[in-house]
Amino acid sequence: MKGKTAAGGGAICAIAVMITIVMGNGNVRTNQAGLELIGNAEGCRRDPYMCPAGVWTDGIGNTHGVTPGVRKTDQQIAADWEKNILIAERCINQHFRGKDMPDNAFSAMTSAAFNMGCNSLRTYYSKARGMRVETSIHKWAQKGEWVNMCNHLPDFVNSNGVPLRGLKIRREKERQLCLTGLVNE
């Protein structure tokens, strides 16, 4: 763990400190490798900022209860992050058979849900059908085909229809973590 911090304006915070606090609370299932992946991909900022999507954000990818101009403490950032991770974990448990998943697969899928949101991981809009349809990753998870599920994480690299380098890198890291410890089933 490199203890990476966010770049850019405003005060930064140490991901390693946030991981220690969250893991010490004992409430999340996501393992240390998963927390490192999420934390390093999201970065950590004490001061609120407007993200590229036009949403006020602070801490580690937190968009809930953000007050522009109000700097957060380590404890506040860790509490927000833990709540957001628990939301992502609930998605994986409820919709992707998370309780049956190996820990690394669960942690990687939690990272994807944290980043994309539950609905975007489960379904996408098909122009051809004129409606939202089930994603391949969701289909494989429902079958308990963890290797196939993991190998579909790189399907999610676009933002507004444009592939982003940062998402390609993150999804490949998620895929690698997801496959760690799995055997061909």
Swiss-Prot record:
It is a single-pass type II membrane protein. GO terms for cellular component: host cell plasma membrane; membrane. It catalyses: Hydrolysis of (1->4)-beta-linkages between N-acetylmuramic acid and N-acetyl-D-glucosamine residues in a peptidoglycan and between N-acetyl-D-glucosamine residues in chitodextrins. The keyword Transmembrane helix applies. The chain crosses the membrane at residues 7-24. Residues 25-185 are periplasmic. It is an enzyme of class 3 (hydrolase). Keywords: Antimicrobial, Bacteriolytic enzyme, Cytolysis, Disulfide bond, Glycosidase, Host cell inner membrane, Host cell lysis by virus, Host cell membrane, Host membrane, Hydrolase, Membrane, Signal-anchor, Transmembrane, Transmembrane helix, Viral release from host cell. GO terms for molecular function: lysozyme activity. All the periplasmic cyteines of the inactive, membrane-associated endolysin are involved in disulfide bond. In the active soluble form, disulfide bonds are isomerized and only the catalytic cysteine remains free. One of its GO terms (biological process) is peptidoglycan catabolic process. It is found in: Host cell inner membrane. It comes from the Viruses. Its EC number is 3.2.1.17. Changing C51D: No effect on enzymatic activity. Pfam families: Phage_lysozyme. The active site is at E42, C51. Disulfide bonds join C13-C44, C44-C51. The signal-anchor, which may also be an uncleaved signal sequence tethers the SAR-endolysin to the membrane until the latter is depolarized by the holin, resulting in the escape of SAR-endolysin from the membrane. Belongs to the glycosyl hydrolase 24 family. Signal-arrest-release (SAR) endolysin with lysozyme activity that degrades host peptidoglycans and participates with the pinholin and spanin proteins in the sequential events which lead to programmed host cell lysis releasing the mature viral particles. Once the pinholin has permeabilized the host cell membrane, the SAR-endolysin is released into the periplasm where it breaks down the peptidoglycan layer. This is SAR-endolysin.
